[in-house]
């Protein structure tokens, strides 16, 4: 039986490129090589496409994907050279130029099936501000927030924010994931600095009310018929769950499934599925919730390309549901082909 080609795109232009490499390496080890041939392409910080490795069998634990330190410029290709008839693309890319609809639009122009949400849902979900406004419109609870856009009156924003929110306050770039650029502010001075830091990553800044809450996550899988997982909990040994804690210091553990009341489980899974459909989701996503001590549930964000490292919540959530990592990848490929066929049928 001939193998199907699975194209892995990794790296990318965003500050989350290191997470992308870790995720892609986990995917390349989890693939069922009885069914798939894996071809990998590294996208540099400057947006160049580099042809890297090809795997017909499971690589050793010591083998690493090529990155800036190991690639050769002679391997540079035109982006369109990744095209291969019958191949499915897994864009294991996080953040801007990865989850924001850019690479999805490129792959649609190439007429290649790809894993993950489409152009519209990717771009909406990537923007935390737009996502909040969509979710508010369908009645899904959100923590209180204000917005700052680069060029506006910063002092006026600070006055509005302090009139509506109380410390601690969290400040986030609107279009960034993996907790990149997020700060916790306890004073007006810290709030101003946090906004200025967020502006180095994006021109749109989300300013959120801090809440004392557990962080609970639900995995989603499907196209028209979406399935959700039992929730898992991020248990932190740090003040807040930032990039350093997630990927460098590894100061987190996970409880899967989370120890929460059944009524809360039902509420979270329902909110997750409704949010996924409202944003036009397909393929996969992960919904991140806050659960306060008094039982209030807030949907924090919907992540359209969650981390796929060996310690990432999304694949572990599905393993808890009985879907092993290799089978999860196979299901994602099937969903990608299904949505591609559906999209193509509408263009003929």
Swiss-Prot record:
Its main location: cytoplasm. It comes from the Bacteria. Its cofactor is Mg(2+); Mn(2+). Keywords: ATP-binding, Cell shape, Cell wall biogenesis/degradation, Cytoplasm, Ligase, Magnesium, Manganese, Metal-binding, Nucleotide-binding, Peptidoglycan synthesis. Mg(2+) 2 binds at residues 301, 303. GO terms for molecular function: ATP binding; D-alanine-D-alanine ligase activity; metal ion binding. It catalyses: 2 D-alanine + ATP = D-alanyl-D-alanine + ADP + phosphate + H(+). It holds the Pfam family Dala_Dala_lig_C. The keyword Oxidoreductase does not apply. Binds 2 magnesium or manganese ions per subunit. It is found in: Cytoplasm. Its EC number is 6.3.2.4. Mg(2+) 1 binds at residues 288, 301. It is an enzyme of class 6 (ligase). Pathway: Cell wall biogenesis; peptidoglycan biosynthesis. The keyword ATP-binding applies. Residues 132-334 form the ATP-grasp domain. ATP binds at residues 162-217. GO terms for cellular component: cytosol. GO terms for biological process: cell wall organization; peptidoglycan biosynthetic process; regulation of cell shape. PANTHER family: D-ALANINE--D-ALANINE LIGASE (PTHR23132), D-ALANINE--D-ALANINE LIGASE A (PTHR23132:SF25). Belongs to the D-alanine--D-alanine ligase family. Cell wall formation. This is D-alanine--D-alanine ligase.
